[in-house]
Each structure stands twice: as C-alpha cells, then as structure tokens.
C-alpha cells in the first residue's frame, strides 16, 4: 500500500544545486511547515518509507470564507488546531493550485503574553517518583495488576573470593567514575566561565556529573559550595565573559550587585536541579530493578517471549522525549518529521530542535483538549487534531476519530506515555487492530540499543534503588561520545560556512573584474545598438513577473546572540529587575514544591510500611540548606538595588510599585539598539521585530523576548522569523496551562486544609 504526504512548500520554482546543498546542510525552514499549521496528509497503513509530493504553497490558496468574518474569528480565537488544505477535485493533479481552507476553531482561548520557566519543560525526578508511587498505591487499592520486581526467595550465597572480587570491582568502577565525572565537570565549568553556552545535552551531562560527585562524596558540599560563593567576585573579575558585556550602570556598585545577582541566581537554580537528582536513597535491600529492566528489554528485542502489558506500560514511561530524540537515528528523525509535516532536510541537531518544539506544542494542545473535552470538538477539529498526532484522519467515521483521540489522551496524559513513542508507533504505520501495548512493544523493539543504558539508570532512580557504578560509568561515557560527535558536526558546519563565504567573496571579485572588462566593450557595442533595436523591435516579450515561493526571513545564530545582547542593554538602560525577581520567585516555588513532594512521598510510602526504608540523602539535605541561604542573600541584593533605583528616580516612598507595562518597549527602540550592536539590513531588523510583536501593537515585552531567545540560543541552528512567532505562541499556551495548574493546586490545598481543621 502507498502513502501520500502533501506538505506545504515555500521554495522558489527553481533552485541551484549550491542553494539546495546549503539548505540541506543548514536545515533552513523555507521548505517546512510551521508548528501549528500543517497541510493535509492522506495516509494508509504501509510498512514502507514515508514518501511525499510537494504542492504549491499558500500564494495560490483561495479562501472560500468571507474575509471579514475570517478576520473577526481570528481576532477572538488565537488557537488553531489545524488549517486543512483540500485540493480542488475539478482540476488535474499536476495543476491543482487552488485549495479550500477549512479552519478548526477552539473555544474560549483568551490572549495574553508569554511567561515561561524551566519547570514547563518536564517534571523533576522527585515528581515522577511521587507519581509512580501514587499510581502503584491506587492500583493496589483498586485491586488491579501492579508490576513489582521479583526478589529471589533464596539468594545465592557467594564465596569469600567472589565477595572480594565484587568489592574490588565496585571500588575500581567507583574511583574511575569519580575521576571521569570530575574531569567532565571541570571542563564544562571552564567553558561556562569563558562565556560559552552549554547545549541542552552538555548541560544535562554537567548536571549528572555534579550530582554523581556530590553523591559519592557528600562532604564536598561543605567545601565546594561555600568556596564558589566566596570566590564569586573574583571569578567575575577574572572571567568577564561570564555575562554579556552590555552593562551600562550609573555606578560600579550597581554593576557589581547586578552581576553577582545574575550569577548567584543561575548557580542556585543549578544546585536545586542537582538536589532533585540526588534527593532520595533506599536503605532497604530490594530486587534489582536494573536487572529487571535488562531482562524486559532483552525479551522484546531478542527472545520471543512476550512481556506483560503492565511491564510494557511501566517501562515505556522511561523513554522521555528528549532521551528518545537524542538517540534516534537519522532515518527515524526524518520519518518523524515527515509524519508531523515538518522540514525533513537539515542537520540532526536542527531536526531534533523542531521536533522538540512540535512535541511541546502537542503536549499543550492535549491538555487544552482534555480540559474542553473531546466531545465538544467538531468533525473538522477532530480531523485536524488526529492528523497533527499522526493518526488517520480521512476515510473514518467521526466516532472513530473521537475514539482514537481519547485513546491518545489516555496514554499521554493519564498513563504518561511520552509523545515521541506514541508518534513513532504511528510513523511505522502499525495496524489499527493492534492494542496500545502491542504498538508500544513494536516501537520499543525498533529503538536504538544505546538507549537501554540510559533507561536502565532512570528506572532505578525512580524506584529509589541504587545503580551500580559500572552502569553509571558506561552511561556517562556513552553520553560523552554523543557530545563529541555533536561538536564535530558543528565544527564541520562552521568550516563549511567559512568555505562558502570565501567562495562567495572570490566570485564577487571575479564579477567585479568582468564588470570592468564589460565597460570597455560598451563603446564598441554602442555603434551596433541602433541595428539591434531595429532587428528586435517586433520581438514578443513576456512581461509577467517571475513567480517565487514565499520564504520566511532567516535569523542566524549570530543575530540571535545580538538580539540577546540588545535586550540585556535595554534592561540595563531601564534598570529593570522584573526577570530576576520572577526567576527568584520560581526558584522559591521549586524549593517549596520539592519539600511538599518529599512529604507526600513519605505519606505514600507509609501506606505500604516503607517510610523508614527511603530517606533524603545527606548531600541533598546539605545542598538544600545552602540554596535557602543563597535565596535569602539574593532577596537582600534585590532590595538594595530597588532602594538605589528609588533614590535615583526620586521615589522615596518604599510602597511605590512599578507601573504596568514597565517592561514594554517599542519596536523602534529595539531596532535602534540592534543597529548599534551590529550592522544589519533594515528589512531584516523589521522582520525580526515583527515576529516578536505577536499582537502587532508596536510594543514588545523585554522579558518575553529574552525567554524566547534563551530557548533558541541553546541550539546551534539558524531559524526563521515564522518559527520564532510559533515558539512564542507555544510558550503562551504553556504559561496559560501553568497558571491553571497553579490555581487548581491552590484550591486543592485549601480544601485539604479545611478538611483537616
């Protein structure tokens, strides 16, 4: 059977081979669909590779709706589940360029600005462990099947020689792990001190190595953390590139305090992440969960044994989106991009980035759909939602659409199966008759072997079990090899860019020489011009304009850095501390949630009589005290800076609050500062500013722009202005959901307090 993939095209009709190679290497978004608007895909079950046919883009689209009605609906409803392009059946296949556009409208989606934090991305290990415990206890209360690792009734008694050998191996791998972790941590720290931005993978590796060091040597908390705080002013002097060089303060004291606040805030957030990595440890001896997972993974990949559905669902949760995407092969990444109708040409890093953004958008939409209810969706909305999730959307009944969308929401939101696994099962075109567990089993069979070690560590951490040093060592070395490979790819890309620029300069010089030679021939050819005019006066000429595809303006990595510097400079000119205060409040919320999660874990464990078996690690307790002290010091720094600002502005009343819209700047202000930093064409600056101005009122929130830039800046890729606008919409949805979840948690806590009283 065949599969037909109709994707949107923004490319010109003709391209040179050099431009095609350049776009393939850089992964430009000129050919890709945006994150929320996708084209129509007609797919049937096929074990083959995804194929595709490219149709002309929206330059030839005709809207059948009344334009004024369409604009009114767009203004009051910012969220689209999809825009479906249906080719006109009256036209032949090769000439279909007129489409009927059907819009699927949501309900009650108010517009507001973007505010996002790192907590929107994923849950911490403590939260995932708590969720696992709650699910297990709930199933025990309901009498359902609960998977638990098997424990040998009579453990094999080891000889003295075997015990000595095992202890020697344990300490050998432990010391080797400590040495490698220390080496990696020092190297990453040196990169940070010298102003280099760690990639997403490098930061995860840095966090893991620091957690391992504190876990192996808990007493280092008393040495390293106070030492780092004490030497912070010295580090800022010796390594000025740690922070952007755009500080323009009125006093040296204010500059010093702001730099110290910025670095302390980043350090405290990193330490809080480390705390959650090493939070709990299990003192009781239980079944080896890592061996259970290894047996399960071997069952589904090698042997013909079929694991239970409970095992499949339980272990599928370990393959989180970032873990899965970071280890997928290129053909699998390309297949996912084609399934989601994204740009499938580009580097692996670029493909992963757009997939991560798309998965986050799907996750936000899933929560909004679950809140509104699947039954409230129209047929067009159901088709759009199913197609975006890689499910069959045409040729099926409305009841079938609702059923498969409900099944998706059940697996994703209730069973907590990662979106990447659900999409991979759709990308392989498995039969609809297969159960969800069988689909997940087949998907796990096709995952790379390299993911097994990483998932093996995760399953032990979520179960509070100890992971042996050898497994951790293998995982660390495996991740280090992947980081080196990514760095090699980036270096090759930079070299290719440099070679291309040199080639363009050579071609421009040759063109100048040819132009000079051409001027010499002008006089000789001028004598023959009258004859040429007479000959060609009757020649027919085509005066129609040359059609070119609509292409979004590309923003390079250097321009993203420049935009970040411009926002920092504007913040310093306005003496704004709103972002720092917001991040500090988020950090306080993280610390409070961490404490509440620990208390909940103890209550859940007490239901099974295991509250004494699990305790908070010593390193985690010591780091928590240090983070609380740092929060107190940062509060004092912010208070001191605000007092200085009041004195400078003549506002002596301590109760004065910042006016509404203090963070807003005009587009012209942003463009002016960007011009001062780097010489960029006017049309490029206008396109960047227009992408950031979502509501088109000429005003931009500095903190919102910084958050978007920080998200993009972690990836070494070029990005289009259209994609920047889509990221802002995605972050807006996530913030809306976060506020609703906070309000819901607050109501639940108040109700629980009333019940206790």
Swiss-Prot record:
Residues 476-521, 554-618, 722-755 form a coiled coil. Signal peptide: none annotated. Residues 680-715 form the EF-hand domain. It is a single-pass membrane protein. GO terms for biological process: calcium export from the mitochondrion; calcium ion transport; inner mitochondrial membrane organization; mitochondrial calcium ion homeostasis; mitochondrial calcium ion transmembrane transport; mitochondrion organization; potassium ion transport; protein hexamerization. The keyword Ribonucleoprotein does not apply. Residues 114-215 are mitochondrial intermembrane. Residues 1-113 form a transit peptide. It catalyses: Ca(2+)(in) + 2 H(+)(out) = Ca(2+)(out) + 2 H(+)(in); K(+)(in) + H(+)(out) = K(+)(out) + H(+)(in). It comes from the Eukaryota. PROSITE patterns: EF_HAND_1, EF_HAND_2, LETM1_RBD. GO terms for cellular component: mitochondrial inner membrane; mitochondrion. It is found in: Mitochondrion inner membrane. Ca(2+) binds at residues 693, 695, 697, 699, 704. Belongs to the LETM1 family. Plays an important role in maintenance of mitochondrial morphology and in mediating either calcium or potassium/proton antiport. Mediates proton-dependent calcium efflux from mitochondrion. Also functions as an electroneutral mitochondrial proton/potassium exchanger. Required for the maintenance of the tubular shape and cristae organization. This is Mitochondrial proton/calcium exchanger protein. It comes from Danio rerio (Zebrafish).
